[in-house]
Curated annotation (Swiss-Prot):
<dbReference type="GO" id="GO:0003676">
    <property type="term" value="F:nucleic acid binding"/>
</dbReference>
<dbReference type="GO" id="GO:0006421">
    <property type="term" value="P:asparaginyl-tRNA aminoacylation"/>
</dbReference>
<keyword id="KW-0547">Nucleotide-binding</keyword>
<dbReference type="InterPro" id="IPR045864">
    <property type="entry name" value="aa-tRNA-synth_II/BPL/LPL"/>
</dbReference>
<keyword id="KW-0963">Cytoplasm</keyword>
<dbReference type="InterPro" id="IPR012340">
    <property type="entry name" value="NA-bd_OB-fold"/>
</dbReference>
<dbReference type="GO" id="GO:0005737">
    <property type="term" value="C:cytoplasm"/>
</dbReference>
<comment type="subunit">
    <text>Homodimer.</text>
</comment>
<dbReference type="Pfam" id="PF00152">
    <property type="entry name" value="tRNA-synt_2"/>
</dbReference>
<dbReference type="GO" id="GO:0005524">
    <property type="term" value="F:ATP binding"/>
</dbReference>
<keyword id="KW-0648">Protein biosynthesis</keyword>
<protein>
    <recommendedName>
        <fullName>Asparagine--tRNA ligase</fullName>
        <ecNumber>6.1.1.22</ecNumber>
    </recommendedName>
</protein>
<keyword id="KW-0436">Ligase</keyword>
<dbReference type="Pfam" id="PF01336">
    <property type="entry name" value="tRNA_anti-codon"/>
</dbReference>
<dbReference type="GO" id="GO:0004816">
    <property type="term" value="F:asparagine-tRNA ligase activity"/>
</dbReference>
<dbReference type="InterPro" id="IPR004365">
    <property type="entry name" value="NA-bd_OB_tRNA"/>
</dbReference>
<dbReference type="InterPro" id="IPR006195">
    <property type="entry name" value="aa-tRNA-synth_II"/>
</dbReference>
Length: 467
């Protein structure tokens, strides 16, 4: 039996010329010549480029099946791998047999025709959009980045911790969470105060989908020293923007005996590593993005990979913004959070490279961030990248119980719900720090695909959970 190869193996020169190979995949296009030849463009997802299958009318099923192949049909081809005479391709397969595995029922209504489709349209056929150049390229880049993240942290001595998806804690303290319940919606139990009685629910208390694995991974940090979590998170924000998803993935490392400077270094090393990796592993996909989606994206990745990030305090950033002659839509003032336009000005205009802004006012940051000695700012950091703005957010955590309790009171958080988190400060507390990186935002930045709905397989947004 002829060995089955991927199209990537055939095109990468791993196989000897004139060797008989079998490939499997889906038809992108088919064109026929008057000389009794058909040229089939076949893809299998293993690489960006399809391979050309040359079929002659000598095949037993040529008239009955081969000439009826249309975009989307699945097939198996066996034949000799030869040097191609056509432009823009090095190899092709001279078919000795073609087996049609699956037909497209009605080619005229098949959504993925051989033309350029808008990303908005492709969201409506999310189950078929991986068959397009753009989404298949995004998928391969996503895979390489995910593997590179695990490899980076493994090589740095981190342990991957699987934090829970169902939680009773709100890491962000914002309250924009999806509730998890098995209560009968037609017969909801109430307590003496007329409130929903969650003691009758599955977990015996009110529970939610997690907004972050940070609090849980801190517990393992206090025993394993260097850990990270990489998994799905959920936000019930009613935001229909190109930057928001209700379900997305987060990378959250946490280091014991560490301070703000340590995670600034870690974030820089990680981003540089990821940029180098994607350029090395996904050069064909990045060439496509650079040519058709976001001209300059390769240069941007090379710039980050080679740059030493600028570090400035929030106070200095505000001073620089106030001193600039730039007119901003949103006001610039100490105590206000930086908006995307401010972040991009700092990274693109002022510094012309990634910037790490540190020591933000405590009022605009999370309750768990360590209060600085000035009593006004916390040891927080945001990494701002040219072209997108904030891409990473992190902090040194508050390891002093009395100050953590005070911050929780100021944020109106119920300390009973965070008793286990407070225990981490009562039993062998240590300085520790970590950050969060939104995976989809990273992919969007790397590929230049501007809407995060197009870099996750099945986007979950307000009013949309169709698949």
């Amino acid at each position: 039996m002829t060995e089955v190869f991927t199209i990537k193996q055939c095109l990468d020169g791993e196989i000897s010329i004139d060797e008989t190979v079998t490939v499997r995949g889906w038809v992108k296009t088919r064109r026929d010549s008057k000389a009794g030849l058909s040229f089939i463009s076949l893809h299998d997802g293993s690489c960006f480029s399809p391979i050309q299958i040359v079929a002659t009318d000598q095949l037993s099923n040529y008239q009955k099946e081969v000439t009826k192949l249309t975009a989307g049909c699945s097939m198996i081809a066996t034949g000799k791998l030869v040097a191609s005479q056509g432009k823009g391709q090095f190899f092709e397969i001279q078919a000795e047999s073609i087996e049609v595995v699956g037909w497209v029922e009605n080619p005229d209504t098949y959504p993925i025709q051989a033309k350029r489709h808008t990303l908005e349209f492709l969201r409506e056929v999310a189950h078929l959009r991986p068959r397009t150049n753009t989404i298949s390229a995004v998928t391969r880049v996503r895979h390489s980045l995910a593997q590179a993240i695990h490899r980076f942290y493994h090589e740095q001595g981190f342990f991957w911790v699987h934090t829970p998806i169902i939680t009773a804690s709100d890491c962000e303290g914002a309250g924009e969470m999806f509730r998890v319940s098995t209560l009968d919606l037609l017969n909801i139990p109430k307590n003496d105060k007329g409130q929903i009685d969650f003691s009758k629910d599955f977990f015996g208390r009110e529970t939610f989908l997690t907004v972050s694995g940070q609090l849980n991974v801190e517990a393992y940090c206090m025993a394993m020293s260097k850990v990270y979590t990489f998994g799905p998170t959920f936000r019930a924000e009613n935001s229909n923007t190109s930057r928001h998803l209700a379900e997305f993935w987060m990378i959250e490392p946490e280091i014991a005996f560490a301070n703000l400077e340590d995670i600034c270094k870690l974030s820089q090393n990680m981003l540089r590593y990821l940029c180098k990796t994607v350029l090395e592993e996904r050069s064909d996909d990045m060439d496509f993005f650079n040519q058709f989606v976001a001209p300059g994206c390769i240069e941007r990745m090379e710039h980050i990979a080679d740059s030493e990030f600028e570090i400035m305090t929030y106070t200095d950033a505000i001073k620089a913004l106030e001193a600039s002659e730039q007119k901003f839509e949103f006001p610039v003032s100490w105590g206000l959070d930086l908006q995307s336009e401010h972040e991009r000005y700092l990274a693109e205009v002022l510094c012309k490279k990634p910037v790490i802004v540190t020591n933000y006012p405590q009022e605009i940051k999370g309750f768990y961030m360590r209060l600085n000695d000035d009593g006004k700012t916390v040891a927080a950091m945001d990494v701002l990248a040219p072209g997108i703005g904030e891409i990473i957010g992190g902090s040194q955590r508050e390891e002093r119980l009395e100050i953590l309790d005070r911050r929780m009171d100021e944020c109106n958080l119920n300390k009973e719900h965070y008793q286990w988190y407070r225990d981490l400060r009562r039993y062998g507390t240590v300085p520790h720090a970590g950050f969060g990186l939104g995976f989809e935002r990273l992919i969007s930045y790397v590929t230049g695909v501007s809407n995060v709905r197009d870099v996750i397989p099945f986007p979950r947004t307000p009013g949309h959970a169709d698949y």
